[in-house]
Regions:
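Aromatic-acidic/polar surface patches that form glycan- and anion
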Residues: 27, 73, 103, 163-166
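C-terminal cap of thioredoxin/glutaredoxin-like
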Residues: 1-8, 19-20, 31-43, 116-173
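Structural alpha/beta surface segment adjacent to cysteine/selenocysteine redox centers
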Residues: 33-133
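Short active-site neighborhood of thiol/selenol oxidoreductases, capturing the structured segment around
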Residues: 15-29
Length: 173
């Protein structure tokens, strides 16, 4: 047991100076699974790491292992279906499909314009992802109309929208 405490550290501790950042894409099925856990994650984060920073990209990175975009899409949809079943995430098991382009634009507008912050924003983010991935386009359209009529874009450091290539959701410290 004394060896454990005296052994050399193999990796430097991660710095938390910049907090915790998650990169998402609205049309990425792994992002859909990840946002279902963000509320719980935020509750257990220490105050030193908060607020959780969220970066939403509209650009997909190149698929891995020389896969085509179609092969990657099919693979990720099947993989996410298995993960969702194993971990009890919400997921369309009948016929999972990517959200349509109009719905993606509406979802981004809703998220850009909402004044909600912290945990309330995370709840909205999860709801918007559910609407996208469960093809609840009527609900999404209603929120979109409200957002465009009553809100303006919010510029918050913990919420950013950009075009950096993201293949699948990931965290960065």
């Amino acid at each position: 047991s004394s060896w454990f405490y005296q052994k050399p550290i193999r990796q430097e501790p991660l710095s938390i100076d910049q907090g915790l950042t998650i990169y998402l894409r609205l049309d990425d099925v792994y992002s859909y699974l990840a946002v279902q856990q963000l509320g719980q994650l935020n509750e257990i984060l220490s105050d030193d790491i908060k607020p959780l920073k969220i970066i939403i990209s509209d650009t997909a990175a190149e698929p891995p292992n020389e896969m085509s975009a179609d092969e990657w899409r099919d693979y990720s949809l099947r993989d996410a279906q298995i993960l969702a079943h194993q971990h009890r995430f919400a997921y369309d098991n009948e016929k999972p499909e990517l959200p349509n382009a109009e719905a993606l634009k509406q979802a981004e507008t809703i998220l850009r314009k909402t004044p909600l912050k912290d945990q309330n924003f995370l709840y909205l983010l999860e709801d918007v992802f559910h609407m996208l991935w469960q093809q609840q386009y009527g609900k999404l359209r209603t929120l979109y109309v409200l957002a465009t009529q009553h809100q303006h874009d919010q510029e918050l450091p913990e919420r950013q929208f950009n075009h950096s290539p993201v293949l699948a959701s990931y965290f960065e410290v």
